[in-house]
């Protein structure tokens, strides 16, 4: 009985399966918090700067209110 694939094709199929399994296990066993620590730091820094900027406004909130027009 002959195999439907050559030895080279079988080697590539096994290699692809091994790499796919490796990435699957890596995605399962890595914590998303470890990967996003830097992103969280940058988001917190942006929020802090935004709050500081809001506190430094020179104009009042009344100047920025939109008045609705009555027909």
Swiss-Prot record:
Record localization:
Membrane
Give residue spans, biased composition: Basic and acidic residues.
58-71
Gene this protein is translated from: Smim31
Q: Which GO terms describe its cellular component?
A: membrane
- For whether the record's keyword set contains Acyltransferase, the answer is no
Record keywords, A-Z: Glycoprotein, Membrane, Transmembrane, Transmembrane helix
Q: Give the way it sits in the membrane.
A: Single-pass membrane protein
The transmembrane residues are: 8-28
The keyword Transmembrane is assigned to this record: yes
Compositional bias, Basic residues, is annotated for 48-57
Name of protein: Small integral membrane protein 31
* Residues glycosylated per entry: 58
Protein's organism:
Mus musculus
């Amino acid at each position: 009985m002959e195999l439907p694939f050559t030895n080279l094709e079988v080697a590539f199929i096994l290699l692809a399966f091994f790499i796919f399994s490796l990435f699957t296990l890596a995605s399962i066993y890595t914590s998303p918090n470890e990967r996003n620590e830097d992103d969280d730091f940058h988001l917190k820094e942006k929020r802090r700067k935004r709050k500081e900027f809001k506190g430094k406004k020179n104009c009042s909130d009344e100047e920025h209110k939109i008045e609705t027009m009555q027909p």
